[in-house]
Amino acid sequence: MYTYGIIENVLDAKKYYDGWIVRVHHNDTVPTGIIDWLKKQDNVEVVYHPGTKKKASNTLWRFEDLFIKDAIVLSRDADSRFSEREVKLVKEWLDSTKDFHIIRDHKHHMVPILAGTFGCRNNCLEYIGIPVPLRNINSIPTQYIEGKSLMDEFI
């Protein structure tokens, strides 16, 4: 399902997101024929992660892209398809001053961020504020850490 889906998305990206690069994260569980095909596409960058384990944390590899300096990043699952609605909403976001963007694929999706499209630009996750207990009334209530460091703790 995912290998077929990424092929379909790579082909559709040429139509919906002309000029964009599709970054595909994978490990050794993906058939080499699929990887060879992906490497031949002019709109694909393949990112290899060693190993053969199918772990839940593999789904977090995509978040590494959010820390590419000065990049505009859109993320979605390989089993989700692009749509005219999505492209219109992404264009509206790019024309706005907002740094973060979320699209829910269905009106009943109530989780803050699902596998539908989300985007980040202007290095908006370079530093993430984490609430810290107040030691005294004059202390700063938020500690900022590098977003990449926080992500590395979960992968």
Task: State where each predicted segment sits.
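Conserved donor-nucleotide/metal-binding helix-loop-beta segment in metal-dependent transferases, i.e.
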Residues: F82-I113
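Soluble or luminal CAZymes and related metallo-dependent hydrolases
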Residues: Y2-G5, N58, E146-M151
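N-terminal anchoring/stem segment of glycosyltransferases
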Residues: M1-G51
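Short acidic donor-binding/metal-coordinating loop in glycosyltransferase active sites
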Residues: G51, A78-S80
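Conserved hydrophobic/aromatic beta-strand scaffold that supports enzyme active sites
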Residues: D65, F100-I102, T117-G119
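Catalytic core and acceptor-binding pocket of nucleotide-sugar-dependent glycosyltransferases
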Residues: K107-M110, T117-I155
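Short aromatic/hydrophobic "clamp" motif used to bind/position activated sugar donors
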Residues: V73-S75
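A short, glycine-/small-residue-rich helix N-cap motif at loop->alpha-helix starts
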Residues: T52-W61
